[in-house]
Amino acid sequence: MCGITAIFNIHDGAQALRKQALLMSKRIRHRGPDWSGIYQGKTAILAHERLSIVDPASGGQPLVSPDGKLILCVNGEIYNHQELRERLKGDYEFQTGSDCEVILALYKKKGIDFIEDLNGIFAFALYDEEKEVYLIARDPIGVIPLYIGYDDKGHLMVSSELKGLEGFATHYEPFLPGHYFYSEDRKLTRWYTRDWMDYANVKDNPTDVQQLHDALEAAVKRQLMSDVPYGVLLSGGLDSSITSAIAKKYAAKRIETNGKADAWWPQLHSFAIGLKDAPDLIAARKVADAIGTVHHEIHYTIQEGLDALRDVIYHIETYDVTTVRASTPMYLLARVIRSMGIKMVLSGEGADEVFGGYLYFHKAPNAQAFHEETLRKLSKLYLYDCLRANKSLCAWGVEGRVPFLDKEFLDVAMRLNPVAKMCPGTTIEKKILREAFSDSLPKEIAWRQKEQFSDGVGYGWIDTLKKITSESVTDEEMANAAKRFPINPPQNKEEYYYRSIFEEHFPSESAARSVPSIPSVACSTAEALAWDSAFKNMNEPSGRAIKDVHESAY
């Protein structure tokens, strides 16, 4: 994972703006501690902070085309770069082994109509020096963060994190996933669309468990592309256990050679974190023993988590309650992972959105409502779990990859008949996924009830957060929350507490507007609150809020 910043539409004062670009880039250097690079042209400046995963020796950025006319900064990984290189032979002379250089080759051949060719996670800025035009784009789901802004002199700016724009841009906002901005068009254009985004196109589809199994296995396998040591996040939940089991299956060989050469680091390391005797830790041990990873169990105390909150909010750039709760242990874990020399990990984010794994999905009234809620969850994932999966790890220079959000896998999983995903009454959630991988995991793991990460690390973590924030914020402060925070007024004392810290770091209106603030039960969207009358008077993102479903409900 890396960090990018760029300033476009420069007409004068380029030297002063170069200094600004360096300052912007320095704010996100934690994302790419291995090297810094900058390009200054007539109308654009692009800066890059590198975390080297593929081609550490020659893959530095900004990348430049052989004729020197195209300049590119990318934060991401292009998983199908080898196939694309083969396809582009003869059309482009590659200068490096970087997976991202295929973007330059594709642009040179096809202009801006190439983004659909990419399978990966990415945010990039490309400058065409000859035409004096630029192209900015973001991956389909928004796994990689990106923000776009403007100043009062008409400069357009982008940054991997909002802290790179805070104080420099007069207005900024998240760059929408699945979109691109081309300077000739002067607008955001959606490039990522799928037939499965319409319920009518999936409602009569068949369900093939083997196809689902094979598609996820292929996604994990291609995401093992790495020239540095990697590991897996193993919470002991279904999703991370599946990705870990598949990764272990292929870890002994280099996937870059189609399994012909031995892996440089053939022993797979797995990582779990929690309070002592947390549900996740116990489950993770069982999985690690069963699949044969070198397992690392990290304990943290509630006080250590509380002490980290201010830094966590600075890095993940949100005041959303469930994201802060879950990001704190992951932030602590990332530090340990990096201290062991590991720079990339696979995780299980996205499965609950794709398969309706959150416990409130038990209340879905019909297949159409179920499917449309998964679409809403996927479309907003960049504002929630993607922040945790990316920014809490990148705070320590660790890259997170998410096979459940792989573009090719999504086309298989989201075209499944929604009826096969539903979990009415006491039917266990994600049943079809469990069936697909039941032979790969211990039975008690394959059929373990969904536990949100912030719950699974230990119930005492959330319970203490609620208690301390309730005691720290007075009733009077809460009553006047809308006066202090007119944009997205906090809905409870815990959110008020996090919002106060967020405002200290990022005081602008743009920062406040970049974070969603909606009522939620067990991570539901606002629309799903209509599924159960009991939801109407609740606002608790923990899965334990779902009575008659969660085994340890409040």
Task: Label every PLM stretch briefly.
Residues I342-D352, Y358:
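Short acidic/histidine-rich active-site segments
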Residues M1, S339-L346, P365, F370-Y554:
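Adenosyl-5′-phosphate
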Residues M1-Y319:
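Cysteine-centered catalytic environments shared across enzyme families
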Residues L17, N80, T96-D99, L118, ...:
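Hydrophobic (often cysteine-bearing) scaffold residues that line and stabilize catalytic clefts
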Residues V209, I273-A334, Y360-A369, K391-S392, ...:
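ATP-dependent adenylate-handling ligase core
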Residues A125, V321-L333, L375-L378, V473-A479:
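Short, basic, helix/turn surface patches
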Residues L104-A105, S241-K248, Y331-R335, G356, ...:
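Short, hydrophobic alpha-helix immediately C-terminal to the catalytic nucleophile
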